[in-house]
Amino acid sequence: MSSYCVIGSGISGATIANLLCKKNSVHIYDKARGPGGRCSFKRINNLEGFDHGAQYISPKSIQFRKFIEKLLKKKILKIWSGKHIYLNKIKKKNKKHVKIIGTRGNNDISKYLIKNIQCYFHSELEKIKFINNKWKLDFKNNQTKYYDNLILTFPFPQLKKLTKKFIKDPFIKKKIKMDANITVMIKTKKSNKNISSFLFNDKILGWAAKENSKKRFKNNYDLWTLQSTHEWANKRISKNKENKKDNSKILINKFFELSGIKKTKILTSLNHGWKYSSNSRPFRLKSY
């Protein structure tokens, strides 16, 4: 039986691992604390938490739509209904647009796909070598592993750094600009506004989602996920760790200003920076 190592537990990594594990030995490694990649869910208490990565799924291709429909039937996913306020003047609102989310969190797809696969979290890949027909993998936690096959599903800039010695295809020499995102998660006193999300028309704050509206939990507080615009985050992401407090304050103040919700005491505030959040011009190449 051939051994496979999949780096990354996002939708891509989880799907590949799920297909391979039917006839092969498969292990997954991820530097994060849990599965999901850019569909991560930040749990704070029992069922309460924040979708602090991808906010929802809206499948466009026929293949992906069929995949999502199966998960909807299995109740792994559900439709996020409610009042979605559309304030952006550049993007046109699509009335047929459906927002699909995880039943318990947006990492539910990954959790479902890898439920029978051995996963190793807190494991960041640092170096790779190909020795005697085996991939030697050195991780930052001082572990070394060997596998017959290696599959990498992380962002292109990280992939390029690790694999440029091994991949001869011209695509590896290309330059690709990925956008950043700074996400702030807040817990406040309950407001009387029954809103699911805001899509803002602002240079700093792009989006706000009310986690309570996803009907995963009940409590006496409001949980909001705030996401910056890419333009603003691109300028600040390199020093977000040092400036978390200031960046969070800017986004929180913008939220109250733009939403019209009365400013109240912040009971919890978390900040997460996505250096490689998304890419507006992806390669046509889907895999290599």
Identify the residue ranges that each predicted region occupies.
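A conserved short coil-to-beta-strand element within the FAD-binding core of flavoproteins
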Residues: 121-136
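Glycine-rich FAD pyrophosphate-binding loop
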Residues: 5-9, 18-45
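N-terminal FAD cofactor-binding segment of flavoenzymes
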Residues: 19, 40-85
